[in-house]
Amino acid sequence: MNLQRFPRYPLTFGPTPIQPLKRLSEHLGGKVELYAKREDCNSGLAFGGNKTRKLEYLVPDALEQGADTLVSIGGVQSNQTRQVAAVAAHLGMKCVLVQEHWVNYEDPVYDRVGNIQLSRMMGADVRLVSDGFDIGIRRSWEEAMESVRQAGGKPYPIPAGCSEHPLGGLGFVGFAEEVRAQEAQLGFKFDYIVVCSVTGSTQAGMVVGFAADGRANRVIGIDASATPERTHEQITRIARHTAELVDLGRPITTADVVLDTRYAGPEYGLPNDGTLEAIRLCARLEGMLTDPVYEGKSMHGMIDKVQLGEFEPGSKVLYAHLGGVPALSAYHETFRNG
């Protein structure tokens, strides 16, 4: 496997820490050891997160093309767009963000706080659009890029989650290589890796990276899209493309892509009672915060799978904390009493 041939622009602090979740493990019976890899602490750029790791491989391409404006898209409380805005500010580039109405959640301050507030503070041109949730290529995003061209700028396209970008899976191939180096220091290997999936390139990169040592199907995606068939297809397609890019040496099969669909409800961006319980439990036992859109759902999935006995006794499970906490303030009614 050859990830090193791709240029990488450093935006992160370095390898993200792996933290034992001792109290949560004990609370759940102590038969499974839980750990978290803290991608939410990976950068000084506006709280970082998983997209910052991905953007390290997109930035060299943007610079080589002579782009002057990063153009991205997401929901109103998109973590992706906040991280793109931070990278643009860091590079001295302009930034245009299309923020669609992906979540059926009404709150008078939803579009004024959290991620979107931070993006505005960093100077991004934020454009609110009424279109609903979709993980594919969007006309509103293409129109934003054309508007930059018409104004004499040179846009660089960054799709939702970086996922439809040809280089979008590379960052989390690197994640897997990083975990292997940390496992060598820890003296053990993780039996499972739990990760939230929506647009797909995070899990796709992990699948490719862990396929190198036979653990592709030990990457357990927890769907948060509530459109699991499309998400599974997108993960698989991105993984196959990424495997070719890095010369994995074997094809990615549908069996390599494991996506648990039980925890996405009631729909994208809205938590169910189990997700809210998981968010509060993790916060109160570990002081680790998760959000109701993404990480709360993957935390719910991991906790439930432990309780159901779906991880063998003695298993070591790594939870990939991808970020997302800045969105919590947009759900202030949900968490008004903690």
Curated annotation (Swiss-Prot):
<dbReference type="GO" id="GO:0018871">
    <property type="term" value="P:1-aminocyclopropane-1-carboxylate metabolic process"/>
</dbReference>
<dbReference type="GO" id="GO:0009310">
    <property type="term" value="P:amine catabolic process"/>
</dbReference>
<keyword id="KW-0378">Hydrolase</keyword>
<comment type="function">
    <text>Catalyzes a cyclopropane ring-opening reaction, the irreversible conversion of 1-aminocyclopropane-1-carboxylate (ACC) to ammonia and alpha-ketobutyrate. Allows growth on ACC as a nitrogen source.</text>
</comment>
<dbReference type="InterPro" id="IPR005965">
    <property type="entry name" value="ACP_carboxylate_deaminase"/>
</dbReference>
<dbReference type="InterPro" id="IPR020601">
    <property type="entry name" value="ACP_carboxylate_deaminase_bac"/>
</dbReference>
<dbReference type="GO" id="GO:0019148">
    <property type="term" value="F:D-cysteine desulfhydrase activity"/>
</dbReference>
<comment type="similarity">
    <text>Belongs to the ACC deaminase/D-cysteine desulfhydrase family.</text>
</comment>
<keyword id="KW-0663">Pyridoxal phosphate</keyword>
<feature type="active site" description="Nucleophile">
    <location>
        <position position="78"/>
    </location>
</feature>
<dbReference type="InterPro" id="IPR027278">
    <property type="entry name" value="ACCD_DCysDesulf"/>
</dbReference>
<protein>
    <recommendedName>
        <fullName>1-aminocyclopropane-1-carboxylate deaminase</fullName>
        <ecNumber>3.5.99.7</ecNumber>
    </recommendedName>
</protein>
<dbReference type="InterPro" id="IPR036052">
    <property type="entry name" value="TrpB-like_PALP_sf"/>
</dbReference>
<dbReference type="InterPro" id="IPR001926">
    <property type="entry name" value="TrpB-like_PALP"/>
</dbReference>
<feature type="modified residue" description="N6-(pyridoxal phosphate)lysine">
    <location>
        <position position="51"/>
    </location>
</feature>
<dbReference type="GO" id="GO:0030170">
    <property type="term" value="F:pyridoxal phosphate binding"/>
</dbReference>
<comment type="subunit">
    <text>Homotrimer.</text>
</comment>
<dbReference type="Pfam" id="PF00291">
    <property type="entry name" value="PALP"/>
</dbReference>
<dbReference type="GO" id="GO:0008660">
    <property type="term" value="F:1-aminocyclopropane-1-carboxylate deaminase activity"/>
</dbReference>
